[in-house]
């Protein structure tokens, strides 16, 4: 990882968004609409249906039809979220140092139209390599910030339900694995 440097300068970069899902017909429209409503428009979306048995694929396909930056795949058999994410991030990226990978599950959504702008600022203001977010559940329960002692002693895995499902990281970090 010696070659990974920060995105300190203000520049446009690409969000490489992966939406893996299985049987999300009640949620996938809200998820994809939340991406379409983003004020920051430099993104591509890889939607991966993991062999759903409901109408999830049809709903997603209708939403992303005629959108050049959306690609949808339907697996013929269950592959699992990790496999779908790996395959999506293994596609050729022209400028990996200017690309941020983002994973959002098909039953989640971006709360605000400024989420991508917010993330862009976080990546350009520091040498940020990876982010995790907080969350607000449909019942109004908000995720918590990690207490200082958890951060100090790197105890993240011992404290569940603090971070959300929204995960982002630099694509060049992905390539260095």
What are these regions (language model features)?
Residues 1-177:
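Nucleotide-sugar donor-binding/catalytic module of glycosyltransferases
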């Amino acid at each position: 990882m010696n070659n990974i440097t920060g995105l300190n300068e203000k520049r446009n970069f690409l969000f490489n968004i992966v939406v893996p899902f299985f049987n999300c017909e009640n949620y996938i429209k809200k998820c994809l609409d939340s991406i379409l409503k983003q004020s920051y428009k430099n993104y591509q979306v890889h939607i991966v249906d993991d062999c759903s048995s409901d109408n999830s694929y049809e709903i997603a396909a209708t939403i992303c039809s005629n959108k050049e930056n959306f690609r949808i795949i339907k697996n013929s058999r269950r592959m699992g979220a990790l496999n779908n994410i790996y395959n999506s991030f293994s596609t050729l990226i022209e400028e990996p140092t200017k690309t941020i990978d983002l994973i959002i599950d098909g039953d989640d959504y971006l709360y605000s139209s400024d989420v991508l702008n917010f993330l862009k600022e976080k990546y350009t203001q520091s040498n940020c390599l990876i982010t995790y977010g907080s969350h607000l559940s449909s019942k109004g329960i908000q995720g918590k910030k990690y207490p200082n002692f958890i951060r100090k002693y790197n105890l993240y895995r011992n404290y569940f339900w603090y971070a959300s499902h929204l995960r982002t990281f630099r694509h060049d970090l992905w390539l260095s694995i």
